[in-house]
Amino acid sequence: TGFYDIPYLLNIPGEELDKVLHYYNESHPYYQMNIAIVGAGNSAVDVALDTYRKGAKSVTMIIREKEIGKNIKYWVKPDIVNRIESGEIRAHYESELIEIKEKTIIIKSSNGQKEIENDFVLAMTGYQPNYNILKKLGVKINNDEFKTPIFNESTMETNVNGVFIAGVICGGLKTNKWFIENSRDHSKKIISSISKNSS
C-alpha cells in the first residue's frame, strides 16, 4: 500500500505553503536554513538530528508532549536528548504550531505565543496507510482502533491465498510498531512460504 500515502495534516493557516513538507528524504535543501520540525516520534528525531548534522542554521522541534516520544529507538534517544540539553537543537515542549507564514511560524505554549524565523516546516506527524488495494483484494482488516490487516505472522500471508504483506502496514494505524530494523525478516518469511507452496 505504501506507508507514505495519507499524511496526518496540521489543519492550520499556512500549511498549504510550499515550505511545508510532510515527507523528508534528504538534508541538503535545508543547509543554512531555519528548520521547524513538528512531532517527537522516530521520524521527527531522525530529521532533527540529520538536518542539525548537515548544517541547518537552526533546528527547532515543536512537541505537544512534555518530552521526546517514549517509543524512540533506544540507540537514538540519548543523542537527541543530549542535542536538546546542549541547546544545539531547540525543543518547545507542550507546544503546538498554530500558524505558518512565509518567513516565520507562530508557536503556542502555556507561556503564550512566540513567533520565530523559519524557512521550512517539516511536519513529521505520521501517515495513515492506504487500505484501498488490500480491500480490493479482499484482505480482511481487524475492526479495532489500529485497523490491523489479518495475516499469519509466521508466513506473512493474509486471509487471501497468495497475498502477503510486509513492513509498516502489518501494524495498521500503529505505524511505530514496525520499521526497517525489526521487519527485515518479513521478506524471508514470505519467500520461504512461497517456496514451500510452489514445490
Regions inferred by a protein language model and the residue ranges of each:
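Short glycine-rich loop/turn motifs that provide flexible caps or phosphate-binding loops at active sites
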Residues: 1, 38-40, 125, 137, ...
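A Rossmann-like FAD-binding core segment of flavoenzymes
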Residues: 53-146
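Glycine-rich, phosphate-binding/catalytic loops in enzymes
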Residues: 13-17, 54, 138-142, 182-184
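Rossmann-like dinucleotide/flavin-binding elements
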Residues: 22-67, 114, 133, 154-199
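Residue-level marker of positions within ordered structural domains that often coincide
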Residues: 2, 85, 102, 139, ...
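Internal, well-ordered alpha-helical segments in soluble enzyme and binding-protein domains
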Residues: 16, 43-47, 76
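FAD-binding core/adjacent interface of flavoenzyme oxidoreductases
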Residues: 1-33, 108-112, 117-125, 129, ...
